[in-house]
Amino acid sequence: LFRSGMIERDVNHPSIIWWSNGNEKGWNTELDGEFHKYDPQKRPVIHPQGNFSGFETMHYRSYGESQNYMRLPEIFMPTEFLHGLYDGGHGAGLYDYWEMMRKHPRCIGGFLWVLADEGVKRVDMDGFIDNQGNFGADGIVGPHHEKEGSYYTIKQLWSPVQIMNTSIDKQFDGKFSVENRYDYLNLNTCRFLWKQVKFPLATDASNAAVQVLKEGEVQGSDMVAHSAGILDIKTNILPNADALFLTAIDPYGHELWRWTFPVNKLNQQTEQLSPLSS
């Protein structure tokens, strides 16, 4: 079963880059040598939450402890580093951990626990999903794969295209600072859609929609993988625009992320209210 049910079944799967022997250190050590007998690529065997074959995979270390692990000679790759239930959602703290991980040469990433909420569909309770209170509600998505709040945080932080601007104002000239975090693709394989919009007022009808004032599309700048530069969407902010939407689309037509930049009108309002403005 070990040979046919896992190794021979998955030996050519493109997503298999390690073999995981057990969980939380595991006790199947007698099987460690069996993997390479049937794997021509002889991919590394790891023991999650253990230090084995050059990988330190310890789970749920604090931010400070994680930095200490990165000073050790082994590759640091926590096979669980944020828990969807006990850490208050996968998005809580992910930015801080991820920025530390991606900048450190000894860390190659980590894993979140877990993809989907887990539970037993009770036929004796009219299909109610029983996860013993909240013990199985630790997924990025729900039991029916509905998107939860952390889904969007993860999508934003792990997007291979990152806009570094945090705000814009009425003097915005259309130029964004951008990082291309793809491993191989040039940013010019992506395209960017933008919209300047005006939001309904609280006094407007309840069915009032966001008004698109102006929109356009640009190709990504010529920017090789793992580099930074400028993306020019070639527009200035309209006087009555409340926000600018910017959407990155990958070469296959999938949305990477959509950023919303409220137009900072503080200076404009100050000028209007100040008696010195005249």
Regions picked out by a protein language model, each given a short descriptive name:
Residues 100-278:
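Carbohydrate-binding surfaces of carbohydrate-active enzymes
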Residues 2-145, 149, 153:
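Substrate-binding/catalytic cleft of secreted carbohydrate-active enzymes
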